[in-house]
Swiss-Prot record:
Spans annotated as Disordered: 1-124
Organism of origin: Neurospora crassa (strain ATCC 24698 / 74-OR23-1A / CBS 708.71 / DSM 1257 / FGSC 987)
Protein name per UniProt: Ribosome biogenesis protein erb1
Residue stretches of biased makeup (Acidic residues): 15-25, 34-67
Keyword annotations of the record: Nucleus, Repeat, Ribosome biogenesis, rRNA processing, WD repeat
Gene Ontology BP term (one): maturation of 5.8S rRNA from tricistronic rRNA transcript (SSU-rRNA, 5.8S rRNA, LSU-rRNA)
Any Pfam family the entry gives: BOP1NT
Name of encoding gene: erb1
GO cellular component, one term: nucleoplasm
């Protein structure tokens, strides 16, 4: 009798399934018998299965048709076969069945509602329900890590050597010892190595110990000499100190050497050596492919480079001899003239004892190298060299690894250097456009300002209230305003284009007596003018400046004198006594610098020719010295002797301003190339300190005139830098320069920030004028 269609047997193959989707997850762990039993059944019934399959194919076709007509929810035999791991290929006459490995052929087919238990007979013959063990996969309810099947704990497995079991599972059942094969089985297992095979046995379960994919990948990386953890980077990016840490100022500002910009002569020699070899045929630039392949094969041969190496003992006591110093220019056979000794120097050298001579030879000059005689002291020098190498002890000097921060001087904390301005106390608003200049009067009560709107305004310092203003021009801006430094008057000077105005503003603190004294000082000089010509001017030539009244309208507002020069005035600086002031016109060329005498209404041009364009000028606070700054240098002149004293070289590309310390021995310079330079006039003409703290040009620099060790600079980046600059009385000590505060408040308009600043004559306060049209008082 032929078997039914539902009892078809499956052919078991050794190939692995192509994907997990073709096999239902219910079949995991369903194989309860060994593969040997399946192989034996397959060999015995091979011929019987062929006949059964042919007879059962027709019955399966009829059942498939009936099942498909009854319900759509019930899968057909072909679909059931696919669910059971069988691939069915239907044809018109026959049905081919291909069995898929990993599926138990004896297990009955299950539908979607299959139960997770089976019915067995107990010892009394009653039915007993045996449930399948739960497989805690990722989709199951148990998401914890899989526990070990053997729950005996961490005890030696030798305790179970005399028992047939090796432990107990979580339900208390004995875990029987698995059967072990003979030597032939072990040999066959080693030949047919499955994936993850190790040849080891798990002592807790007795089963072969196999490796998973992650463990196999770890073993592969170790065998290849790679890092076990693929996420670890064995070569992290090194962070060098001098590139990883951003420095505000360079550790070394030395200029680049010339050899950096010249081609290497050694490389040229190597290249010419290769060129000659190619020309002579010793080097073939092109090799046939056959020779190239042979060379590549030879290069691929690996060998141990340390095979014949003999270990050598390192002698730590050996120190190489120091090298002789290279010869200098004076040892040349044709040295420069400045190296040749004079007659007096030669006689003095010959009178000295050989031990007292600085050099053992005198430079000599020869016309050619063939005329140079033999050196008579060669034997003596070589003997002394040998004696030095033999007798002089040698010391190995270790290179010091010093942190660059430890080389910097220990500066005091800014909190210990107070008082200095920290916050913006008052904001003055009223100008239309930029405020180009600002100045505090000698009494410290009023502030004067000038801007692009052509007006000069006077404000109360503490309240910020405007007390006086005058319109000097409607077309040109007020470039600068400066107060007369003497306290016996209340005189303000302002420059608009080619005109310099002297005025007496009205203020609540100005008494009638002080106002009258100021007007008398300005009017006293008109008695020295004769026929409208200046004293000292050659007859028939135009005077360097014209002193005149500005007009009735301006005189009623307090403007008393107008001085007209030949070009636009950018800078005004007063002498400490208040009788002289200097004006600078950068576009004036010969008449760019002028010195005016207030008591005589006299203007003088001190320079007939000035090397470079004048940028600013200032008087020395104590001595009769006059400083004039061009684009790159600052020249110091003696006004009594009428001679040049020194030329200070800051090293800046374009000087914007400078100021002299009240002590007279130090100088600070601001430049358009973002640098602030401190000069010690007694030390050198070069800068003592160079500070690069700004990102834009430095417009103005000022010392505090009231005895406080403070100075500041204003920049186009919209900030003011406040510094503590202490000048010691002892000339052997260096000045102490500490940056203490950065004042931010002005806005940058059209790449212009803070244009001018000035200190209070007594308090640690300062005012600043910005391109945003505001004036700020910092306290």
């Amino acid at each position: 009798m032929g078997p039914k269609a539902t009892e078809k047997k499956r052919k078991v193959q050794d190939a692995e399934p192509e994907s997990d989707d073709e096999i239902a997850p219910d079949f995991d762990g369903a194989l309860s018998q060994s593969e040997d039993e399946f192989d034996s059944d397959f060999d015995d019934n091979e011929h019987e299965q062929d006949g059964e399959q042919e007879s059962g194919s027709e019955a399966s076709d009829d059942e498939d048709e009936e099942g498909s007509l009854l319900s759509d929810d019930i899968p057909s035999d072909a679909e059931g076969d696919k669910a059971m791991g069988k691939l069915v290929l239907e044809d018109e006459e026959e049905e081919l069945e291909i069995e898929i490995p990993g599926v138990d052929p004896k297990r009955p087919e299950k539908d979607d509602g299959d139960k997770n238990y089976r019915i067995e007979k107990d010892a009394n013959g009653n039915e007993r329900y045996v449930y399948d063990e739960i497989d805690p996969v990722y989709d199951s309810d148990d998401s914890d890590a899989q526990e070990a099947p053997n729950t005996i704990g961490n005890i030696p497995m030798s305790f179970y050597d005399s028992y047939p079991h090796i432990g107990y599972d979580i339900n208390g059942k004995k875990i029987m010892r698995p059967a072990t094969g003979d030597a032939l089985d072990a040999l066959l297992d080693s030949i047919e190595v499955p994936k993850g095979w190790t040849g080891l046995t798990d002592i807790h379960t007795g089963n072969p110990l196999n490796l998973n994919d992650d463990e196999l990948e770890l073993v592969r990386r170790v065998q290849m000499g790679m890092i076990p953890n693929e996420l670890e980077n064995p070569y992290p990016e090194t962070v060098e100190y001098f590139t990883g840490i951003e420095e505000k100022m360079p550790l070394s500002a030395a200029p680049e050497p010339k050899r950096r910009f010249l081609p290497s002569k050694n490389e040229a020699k190597k290249i010419m050596k290769l060129v000659r070899a190619i020309r002579e045929g010793r080097i073939l630039p092109y090799k046939p492919p056959e020779e190239r392949e042979k060379e590549e094969e030879e290069e691929e041969q690996y060998f141990d480079i340390w095979q014949d190496e003999v270990p050598q003992e390192v002698n730590p006591l050996h120190i190489p001899a120091p090298k002789l110093p290279p010869p200098g220019f004076d040892m040349s056979y044709n040295p420069p003239a400045e190296y040749l000794p004079t007659k007096e120097e030669r006689e003095e050298w010959e009178k000295l004892d050989p031990e007292e001579r600085e050099k053992e030879y005198l430079p000599q000059k020869y016309d050619s190298l063939r005329k140079v005689p033999g050196y008579g002291e060669i034997v003596k020098e070589r003997f002394e060299r040998c004696m030095d190498l033999y007798l002089a002890p040698r010391v190995r000097k270790n290179r010091l690894n010093i942190d660059p921060n430890s080389l910097l001087p220990k500066l005091p904390s800014p909190s210990e250097l107070k008082p200095f301005p920290t916050v913006a106390q008052t904001v003055f608003r009223g100008h239309d456009g930029r405020v180009r200049s600002v100045a505090i009067d000698p009494t410290g009560v009023a502030v004067a300002s000038g801007g692009d709107d052509g007006t000069v305004r006077v404000w109360e310092l503490l309240t910020g209230r405007q007390v006086w203003s005058v319109k000097l021009s409607s077309e040109e801006a007020v470039n600068t305003v400066r107060w007369r430094p003497a306290k016996d008057s209340f005189i303000l000077s302002a420059a608009v284009g080619e005109d310099v105005y002297l005025m007496v503003p009205t203020h609540a603190s100005v008494t009638p007596a002080l106002d009258q004294a100021s007007r008398d000082i300005l009017s006293a000089g008109f008695g020295y003018a004769t026929n409208g010509q200046q004293h000292g001017a050659a007859p028939g030539k135009e005077p360097p400046a014209k002193w005149a009244r500005p007009g009735a309208k301006l005189e009623d507002e307090g403007v008393l004198i107008r001085i007209t020069v030949r070009s636009t005035v950018k800078v005004i600086n007063w002498h400490r006594k208040g009788d002289h002031f200097a004006t600078v016109s950068p576009s004036g060329q010969r008449s760019s610098v002028a010195i005016h005498t207030l008591s005589k209404h006299l203007t003088q041009i001190p320079f007939r020719k000035l090397s470079g364009l004048a940028q600013t000028a200032s008087f020395h606070p104590l001595r009769p010295l006059f400083f004039v700054a061009t684009q790159r240098t600052i020249r110091c002149y003696d006004l009594q002797k009428l001679e040049l004293v020194k030329v200070v070289q800051p090293g800046a590309k374009w000087i914007s301003s400078f100021d002299i310390h009240p002590g007279g021995d130090n100088l600070i310079v601001g430049s358009y190339d973002k640098r602030l330079l401190w000069h010690d006039l007694d030390l050198s003409i070069r800068p003592y300190k160079t500070m690069r703290f700004h990102s834009e040009a430095v417009r103005q620099v000022k010392y505090h005139r009231g005895g406080l060790p403070l100075f500041a600079d204003a920049s186009d980046d919209g900030t003011l830098q406040i510094f503590h600059g202490k000048v010691p009385n002892d000339q052997l000590e260096n000045p102490t320069i500490v940056p203490v505060k950065v004042l931010k408040g002005h806005k940058v308009v059209n790449k212009l920030g803070v244009l001018d600043m000035d200190w209070h004559p007594r308090e640690p306060w300062c005012v600043s004028a910005g391109a945003d049209g505001t004036i700020r008082l910092w306290m």
